[in-house]
Amino acid sequence: MELDYRRLGKAYRAQHIQLSGELIMNDLEIFFYENPGNEINKWMHYFEIYDRYFSKYRGTDVHVVEFGVSQGGSLQMWKNYFGDKAKIYGIDINPLCKQLEEDQIEIFIGDQEDRKFLKSLGEAIPRIDILIDDGGHTMSQQINTFEEMFPYIDKNGVYLCEDLVTSDWQKHGGGYKKKRHLHRIQ
């Protein structure tokens, strides 16, 4: 596979180039670079983490929930990665995201701040094997989503919350002096 190495950051190149000079990428990274569909917004270091924890679900009837639909590209990536048996659920506050539904991909419209919505979502989805919180990124959204959705995750499932750094940002309702700061949750 030919890549434009200018698109890859120095740290990323160093991390993925073996002594032979060969660039090694997992299937998610390859999909990201060859993506024929909708835009995908992901930090590059997540792909290795995804593959490490999600690969055991490939080719199974996995149920994946992702908060934060945006352009829908990551939902298409999950569909491609997990295969024909997978069921992908996207959750977003923007009603226009509903237009991104396709075979194997269902989208729910609602607010991550709304605990009633989250509870109804957990009841509406028959099973959750993987939940990815890449939604609004405010501390309260991350905490509400975890508290309301974690009980619905399969006992052997995976709960992955992205961009926790925003919990330290005041503009996202965070800050280390806040009573509900993530470091204080035990």
What are these regions (language model features)?
Residues 1-132, 136-161, 165-186:
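A short alpha-helical cap/connector motif
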